Design a protein with these regions (language model features):
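Cyclophilin-like peptidyl-prolyl cis-trans isomerases
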Residues: 2-11, 18-268
Length: 268
């Protein structure tokens, strides 16, 4: 990872910026006087494309990013007027560190699930790295996630389209104890959520929470990691962050390299 792009910086005491879980890229942003970790992706301006299709006209309105850099264009997901908003889908990420099975919850985020399943079917996640591990455990900061879904492996990659945020799952999360107003949520261990670059900029990057994490309620929750998958996450987290690549030792490439060999529908 280079330091020329903007990056998600966690709110370590030494940092004057707030960490953001960025999808497609990373972006350090100031947040009043209290720096803290965040989750997101920052856009990278690029030459507009004239050959992109229009946005879909169904419930989710998947919208091509004409002015964004994307890594792998595989088209736009199906977008029915009435997508299924019940039940769950299983997806297994076959990684070099073990199988991580995730449960996608259509009741919480039907558009995120529709997009994720589409990308799985297209082989979008195959042979991609999980490029980022965060390990902020010092109070009052908390951000413990593995971030994946970028074919570039840099934090910049995306599928070439955006879709809107869905907050039903976020609203169901418990408030962080010090924030009873809900301005910070406890993205609890096992949560599966979308990274983003700001409101309504979901793409392909996602994060898996291996320990309770304090974040703004800005990241679409669309599922959970199964118990066997959590064991794999714990192994990755225990190895820590690869030293020497980033500004903070709590945030960077995982020391134990993680590569999604294949992503497929169904359980183990």
């Amino acid at each position: 990872m280079t330091t020329t792009r903007t990056r998600m910086y966690a709110g370590a005491a030494a940092a004057a910026t707030a960490l953001s879980l960025l999808a497609g890229a990373t972006s350090a942003t100031a947040e009043s006087s209290e720096p803290e970790p965040t989750a997101g992706a920052a856009p990278d301006p690029a030459t507009a494309r004239a050959d992109l299709p229009p946005a879909t006209t169904g419930f989710c309105a998947f919208t091509p990013m004409a002015d964004q850099t994307y890594s792998t264009w595989v088209g736009l997901p199906p977008d029915p007027k009435r997508p299924r908003q019940w039940g769950a889908d299983l997806v297994t990420l076959e990684t070099n560190q073990g199988k991580i099975t995730i449960v996608l919850d259509r009741t919480k985020a039907p558009c995120a699930v529709e997009s994720f399943v589409f990308l799985v079917k297209q082989g979008y996640f195959n042979k991609t790295k999980c490029h980022r591990l965060t390990a902020y455990h010092t109070p009052p900061y908390a951000l413990s996630v593995l971030q994946c879904g970028d074919p570039l492996g840099t934090g910049w990659g995306d599928p070439g389209y955006w879709f809107r945020d869905e907050f039903k799952g976020v609203n169901a999360l418990p408030n962080w104890p010090d924030f009873p107003d809900g301005s910070r949520k406890n993205y609890v261990r096992g949560t599966l959520a979308m990274a983003n670059a700001g409101p309504d900029t979901n793409g392909s990057q996602f994060f898996l929470v291996y320990d309770d994490s304090r974040l703004r309620p800005d990241y679409t929750v669309f599922g959970r990691v199964t118990a066997p998958g959590m064991a794999v996450l714990d192994k990755i987290a225990k190895a820590g962050v690869k030293p020497g690549e980033e500004y903070y030792p709590e945030d960077g490439a995982p020391a134990l390299p993680v590569r999604i060999m294949t992503a497929r529908r169904g359980g183990a």
